[in-house]
Curated annotation (Swiss-Prot):
This is Ecotin. It comes from Pseudomonas aeruginosa (strain UCBPP-PA14). InterPro entries: Ecotin_C, Ecotin_sf, Prot_inh_ecotin, Prot_inh_ecotin_gammaproteobac. Its main location: periplasm. GO terms for cellular component: periplasmic space. The gene is eco.
Length: 156
């Protein structure tokens, strides 16, 4: 009987923790039909102005030796009444590809990125980066950092 009560307590606590995690995303809207809401939580940095976040959205597709890209634009929106930003990738076009011959090479599954405007964001660990993307699009990210070394331009 004790084991049953303990198991019920653990189940209740774990479901409460899952609900609390979902509430952390509030007040961001739920994803529209056919879209997912993907969230990035960044670690705190001492000098966050020296960092950028590159959003790398894409699909895993069968590809040959050619360079392939998808097209799209990551649009910034503001959450009314809060001033928080969130991002939406509405349309993904392509794939576009170079046209080299690939004799004897098999196609393989590769991550093909979406290229376009709006994918480089400022770094802010205080707020999550919330991206709404089509269900078949995976959102990845990369952190960029500036060098401490600053060069001086030459007058000519």
């Amino acid at each position: 009987m004790k084991a049953l009560l303990i198991a019920a307590g653990v189940a209740a606590l774990s479901s409460t923790a899952m609900a609390a995690k979902l509430d952390e995303k509030v007040p961001y809207p739920k994803a529209d039909a056919g879209f997912t809401r993907q969230v990035i939580h960044l670690p705190k940095q001492d000098t966050e102005d020296a960092f950028k976040v590159e959003i790398i959205a894409g699909k895993t597709l069968e590809a040959d030796c050619n360079q392939q890209r998808l097209g799209g634009e990551l649009e910034e929106h503001t959450l009314e009444g809060w001033g928080y930003s969130y991002y939406r990738l509405d349309k993904v076009s392509g794939p576009m590809s170079t046209m080299m011959a690939c004799p004897g090479q098999k196609k393989e599954q590769r991550f093909i990125p979406v290229v376009g405007e709006g994918f480089l964001l400022r770094y802010n660990s205080k707020l999550p980066i919330v991206v709404y993307a089509p269900k078949d699009v995976e959102v990845r990210y990369r952190i960029w950092s500036a060098s401490e070394k600053v060069e001086k331009a030459v007058s000519e």
